[in-house]
Curated annotation (Swiss-Prot):
Region Disordered, annotated ranges: 147-179
Superkingdom of source: Bacteria
Protein name: Stress response regulator gls24 homolog
PANTHER family (UniProt xref): ALKALINE SHOCK PROTEIN 23, HYPOTHETICAL CYTOSOLIC PROTEIN-RELATED
Family named by the database record: Belongs to the asp23 family.
Organism of derivation: Streptococcus pyogenes serotype M6 (strain ATCC BAA-946 / MGAS10394)
Residue spans of biased composition, Basic and acidic residues class: 165-179
């Protein structure tokens, strides 16, 4: 009599299934962008003229703006244009960026980061950077609020003037001017 043993392990099952896991560039760009949010001394990733203009017009900050990647089957290369904080040591910022990008991409995708190129396109104080983040949308909202307050005040003035005019007319109506 022959005995048959069936070995059922997850490794055997996965090795029998063929397929391929790939990542779109924007997925890796998003991982990199989110990973960079808490790097000390990194104020922002510069998305270029049009991305920056978009951010000035409307409050839409995409974590992918300014992050460019090249994704292969096993490796990733990353290019960044950054704004560094004034009086911070830029090589330390660069080392932090490389470390966190490599760690997060590897942890989430098993891809190896083989290159991280960083170009410092500007240096600003935190105050300068925050002041420049005020968008046109914010300015329009502030103007609308100010206009609304001014209009409300003017409406109250007009109501008071009309009420005074009505009272005067009623006083004049009570006594005829000519007898």
């Amino acid at each position: 009599m022959t005995e048959t043993y069936i070995k059922n392990t997850s490794k055997d099952l996965t090795s029998a299934i063929r397929g391929q896991l790939t990542y779109d560039d924007k997925v890796i760009e998003k991982i990199v962008g989110l990973a960079l949010e808490n790097v000390d001394g990194l104020l922002g990733v510069n998305g270029g003229f049009f991305a920056n203009l978009k951010d000035k017009l409307v409050n839409t900050e995409s974590v992918r703006d300014g992050v460019n990647v090249e994704v292969g089957k096993k490796q990733v290369a990353v290019d960044l244009d950054i704004v560094a904080e004034y009086q911070k040591h830029v090589p330390t910022i660069y080392d932090s960026i490389k470390s966190i990008v490599e760690e997060e991409v590897k942890r989430m995708t098993d891809l190896d980061v083989i290159e991280v190129n960083v170009k410092v396109v500007d240096i600003k104080t935190k105050e300068q950077f925050e002041a420049e983040k005020v968008s046109l949308q914010d300015k329009v909202s502030d103007m609308a609020r100010s206009t609304s307050e001014f209009t409300s005040h003017q409406v109250e003035n007009v109501k008071a003037s009309v009420d005074n005019g009505v009272e005067k007319l009623q006083d004049q109506k009570a006594e005829p001017r000519v007898k």
